[in-house]
Amino acid sequence: MKQIQVNLGVRSYPIYIGQNLMSDGETLSRYLLKKRILIVTNETVAPLYLKQIQETMASFGEVESVILPDGEQFKDLAHLDTIFTALLQQNYGRDSVLVALGGGVIGDMTGFAAACYQRGIDFIQIPTTLLSQVDSSVGGKTAVNHPLGKNMIGAFYQPQIVLIDTLCLHTLPAREFAAGMAEVIKYGIMWDADFFQWLEDNVTTLKTLDAQALVYAISRCCEIKADVVSQDETEQGVRALLNLGHTFGHAIEAEMGYGNWLHGEAVSAGTVLAAQTAKALGLIDESIVCRIIQLLQAFDLPVSAPESMDFDSFIQHMRRDKKVLGGQIRLVLPTAIGRADVFSQVTESTLEQVIRCA
């Protein structure tokens, strides 16, 4: 079992990565003793793992569950209220703990519910998708979507522990695994050139779910994320680099309707647009763009935006992006494999040229 620490003073917490961790009551025990436990999961994950985690936690306290519909389109205030209703109807107090058992949608909603309920109760992340294991479960970003923008209503709120059981990936559909690889590749582009090279050399090994390769890839992503979050918890500086591909990607998700494009698929296409923007500005050359495209394609990810999206449909969403400051769109762009920076002087005419030529 691999352990990584997110260092945030009194809000520090461990990430555990390995196999069969959902049956490891000893690791969970210190976070559950004398607490009432409410597991939040969805209709896809519940038949696979809910009984197992309930049995693991039953010796520590009363365990109940809330099962939500599965999909990004349900990550909204209405379904968040389902969690609050369950907590209130069953008289959960401040000594309770919420457990997020699922992917990024479940993790984001459960974390936000924990941040809000009685002004804050404990929560535990047990991510079951590759995307949530390498990205959304770590760092304390919690939120729900709004029809006018993704993740626009939320809070920074850290979990007590992140428990990553890599065996969950064996029940993950191939499309979901590919979507998670978009975030894995992002870390190589924006932070670690050697890791990017390792990914290029291990495509087949990862796609066949080799246990050692999965633990290494997930661990490296979590190490990078933990390092970045420890430096900049609330995204005032370096943490913004983790948004590589996300400004374009969130525009795709919002325009196409949440759930039609998976988050990772939109990030993949958005990462290519970010690379093409960087090339248009003279920050990188064509060879780097090609390496990025080839690696994304190797994992069966989209490398272009939907044909139905034009510049106008992109820009209306990008102007509402959370990173906008003083009315200026701020983009994370690669400056090399393994390096990225935030740019706020990219003109809309440059963006139009890139989007029209993509």
From Swiss-Prot:
One function term, GO molecular function aspect: 3-dehydroquinate synthase activity
Name of the protein described by the UniProt record: 3-dehydroquinate synthase
Any one GO CC term of the record: cytoplasm
Pathway: Metabolic intermediate biosynthesis; chorismate biosynthesis; chorismate from D-erythrose 4-phosphate and phosphoenolpyruvate: step 2/7
Keyword Hydrolase: no
Chain residues that bind Zn(2+): E183, H246, H263
Any coiled-coil regions, as ranges: none
Family of this protein: Belongs to the sugar phosphate cyclases superfamily. Dehydroquinate synthase family.
EC code(s) of this entry: 4.2.3.4
Annotated organism of origin: Shewanella baltica (strain OS185)
Function according to Swiss-Prot or TrEMBL: Catalyzes the conversion of 3-deoxy-D-arabino-heptulosonate 7-phosphate (DAHP) to dehydroquinate (DHQ).
Key word Nucleotide-binding present: yes
Cofactor requirement: Co(2+); Zn(2+); NAD(+)
Gene Ontology biological process: amino acid biosynthetic process; aromatic amino acid family biosynthetic process; chorismate biosynthetic process
Chief localization: cytoplasm
Taxonomic lineage: Bacteria, Pseudomonadati, Pseudomonadota, Gammaproteobacteria, Alteromonadales
Cofactor: record remark: Binds 1 divalent metal cation per subunit. Can use either Co(2+) or Zn(2+).
SUPFAM superfamilies noted in UniProt: Dehydroquinate synthase-like
